[in-house]
């Protein structure tokens, strides 16, 4: 008996996702498993070929968070062909300044941004603009240096 003839083919097919959003708490304690190379590898395998994963990376202004951000970025960058860190100001978060990760098998967050397609949607947002999108990926020099310290040459 093969699996298809018994109608069980779908059970054995791996689900694939367009987007994985990892909205975890701090990379310590119970959510520590969401910051491992194995977890990022599972996310990579679960994404479609043009899929994207985003995750929180903490604040660079606290030593423990900054070290965790570097570890996380190193693990993601070694797993995904495209890995970038972006920033946002969130007053209710510690230090009011937070970092996030963007990872993809295919798309670069700036080079592949289609601003005209976004404008064609004619959505009115109170926060997001394509200019803000691009600007979020331009990091201060101290952060660029922190990320370079852990990136492997490609």
Language model regions located:
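Conserved class I S-adenosyl-L-methionine
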Residues: 31, 58-69
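Conserved S-adenosyl-L-methionine
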Residues: 81-91
């Amino acid at each position: 008996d093969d699996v298809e003839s018994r109608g069980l083919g779908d059970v054995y097919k791996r689900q694939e996702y367009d987007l994985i959003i990892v909205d975890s708490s701090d990379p310590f304690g119970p959510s520590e498993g969401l910051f491992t190379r194995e977890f990022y590898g599972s996310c990579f395998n679960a994404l479609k070929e043009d899929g994207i994963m985003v995750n929180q990376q903490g604040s660079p202004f606290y030593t423990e968070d900054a070290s965790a951000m570097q570890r996380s970025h190193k693990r993601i960058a070694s797993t995904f062909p495209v890995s970038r860190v972006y920033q946002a100001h969130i007053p209710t978060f510690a230090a009011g300044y937070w970092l996030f990760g963007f990872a993809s098998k295919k798309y670069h967050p700036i080079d592949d941004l289609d601003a005209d397609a976004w404008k064609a949607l004619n959505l009115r947002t109170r926060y997001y603009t394509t200019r803000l999108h691009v600007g979020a990926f331009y990091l201060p020099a101290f952060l660029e240096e922190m990320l370079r310290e852990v990136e492997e040459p490609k």
